[in-house]
A protein has these predicted regions:
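N-terminal, positively charged/glycine-rich alpha-helical extensions of SAM-dependent methyltransferases
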Residues: 1-13
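Conserved alpha-helix/loop element of class I SAM-dependent methyltransferases that forms part
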Residues: 23-40
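Class I SAM-dependent methyltransferase SAM/SAH-binding core
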Residues: 45-98
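A short acidic, Gly/Pro-enriched loop at the edge of an enzyme's catalytic core
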Residues: 97-109
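A short SAM/SAH-binding and catalytic strip from SAM-dependent methyltransferases
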Residues: 108-119
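A short glycine-rich, Lys/Arg-flanked "PGG" loop and its adjoining helix->strand segment in the class I
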Residues: 122-134
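Conserved beta-strand signature within the Rossmann-like core of class I S-adenosyl-L-methionine
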Residues: 135-142
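Conserved Class I S-adenosyl-L-methionine
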Residues: 150-156
């Protein structure tokens, strides 16, 4: 679960299935992060997937070729494996600073509101670079206090 997103003008709201309406604001954050990035027929990794709600949205609305959700919590991954039977999805337990996937295996890496909890953001970003294919995209949002934004910018 994330804090969600609401545009002031509400001009580009995603059209949602009725069963997704209760989760509109968290879904809107994912839609905002994805922006105009094409995910169809791409290999997508989400680091910090939690219980899979964001991944479910990405799979059902953007049709990636494959989706890999990675989370540190074995309980969250077990939840995803039991509850999220989505086509072309897999759920892996692992740390953001040592992603359990091979080099150059992803077209897109997504990270929503979890990097502030990681012990080493520079190591996480090194892992993102390692797993992205040439020309790949890193789609990222998180929160930082104002005095820590420039530190994050240096690492990006």
């Amino acid at each position: 679960m994330n804090y969600g997103y609401a545009e002031e003008q509400q001009k580009s709201l995603p059209s949602l299935q009725p069963e997704d309406e209760p989760f509109r604001y968290p879904i809107q954050l994912y839609a905002h992060v994805v922006g105009g990035t094409e995910l169809r027929h791409k290999d997508v990794i989400e680091v910090g997937c939690g219980r899979g709600g964001g991944g479910s949205f990405l799979i059902r609305y953007f049709s990636p070729r494959s989706f890999t959700g990675i989370d540190l919590s074995p309980q969250a991954i077990e939840w995803c494996r039991r509850r999220m039977s989505l086509q072309n999805a897999r759920w892996l337990q692992g740390s953001a600073d040592a992603l359990p996937v091979p080099n150059c295996c992803a077209d897109v890496v997504v990270n929503v509101e979890s990097s502030h909890c990681y012990p080493s953001v520079p190591q996480f970003l090194a892992e993102v670079r390692r797993v992205l294919r040439p020309g790949g995209r890193f789609l990222f949002c998180d929160m930082r206090t104002a005095n820590r934004v420039s530190e994050l910018d240096r690492h990006l």
